[in-house]
Amino acid sequence: MWLDTRNLGIVISCWKGVCVPQTTTLEMFYNDNDRVEESSNSYQIRREFLLPACLPAFLSFSTSFSFFLSFLPLSLSLFLPFFPSFFLSLSLSPSFLPSFLRQGLALSPRLECDGAIMIHCSLNIPGSSDPPTSAS
């Protein structure tokens, strides 16, 4: 399936949990757990994923992702001494990143009370003239 992350300008093709950037042909794949709503040339897909029981309830995508990226400025500054690590650490700080992810990405997972992650995404067929509808 094609995911149009409009704010980043990236088109991603996902098949069985593996996502790679794509720019050519359109292929739509979805499984029985997906709910697809079609309107003219856009699709709204809602998918549920079960979380493993061993994960703590407070662990969410934005927390783990920002924790991972908080080590990025240090590792880059070790390999690139001339790189402006202050600017990079400011832009990738954990306090800035979760709010950026919530506002900037079209693909936004969130932790539900029943232990499922709901992913709302907007699919836009390449070459269509109408603007894509936004996921709510």
From Swiss-Prot:
Show the stretches that span the lipid bilayer.
Answer: 49-68, 78-100
Has UniProt tagged this entry with the keyword Chaperone? no
Keywords of this protein's UniProt record, alphabetized?
Membrane, Transmembrane, Transmembrane helix
Cellular component, GO annotation: membrane
What subcellular locations does the record give?
Membrane
Give the membrane topology.
Multi-pass membrane protein
- This chain belongs to the protein called Transmembrane protein 78
